[in-house]
Amino acid sequence: MKEIDVGFTHVAFVVRDLENSIDFYSRYAGMEVVHSREPDLPEARKVAWLSDRIRPFALVLVQVDAVTDTPLGNFGHLGVACSSIEEIDNKVAMARMEGILRKEPAQAGEPVGYYVFFADPDGNTLELSYGQKVGIEAFRQDDRVPAS
């Protein structure tokens, strides 16, 4: 019997340069390539699936000849939780040097926590956060995670 994946599995972004995007998400979001292929079609020259290997979810990056998708913009974003404020601040310093800091870090209290926005190589926004409760609350509603 084949395994069937059910539920929320991935988010896909169209990119101009797959290697550049892999480098960005590896350095800023701690993701690694778990699958790659080169269909060499105009709508999918190269494909990579990235994961943090913490949860069963992937960021799918697809390199195309012409990017026509609308970037997520300044607020629409991919959110990644970090293990400390210091980890975020170290990446903020890198982002400042690379000119990709989209919004200064902010402490918004519960349930948002400490967060910052960066621009990825294709204009999408990556949010790094510490202390956000998004994933935990999603499971708590289903009694899978005990209240702290």
Q: Where are each of the predicted segments found?
A:
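Vicinal oxygen chelate
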Residues: M1-I4, F8-R16, A48-R53, T68-S148
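Conserved segment of winged-helix/HTH DNA-binding domains
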Residues: R55-Q63
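A short beta-turn/loop motif at secondary-structure boundaries
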Residues: P39-P42, T68, Q107-P111
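Core segments of cupin and vicinal oxygen chelate
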Residues: A12-P56
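Short beta-strand/turn micro-motifs at beta-sheet edges
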Residues: M1, V62-T68
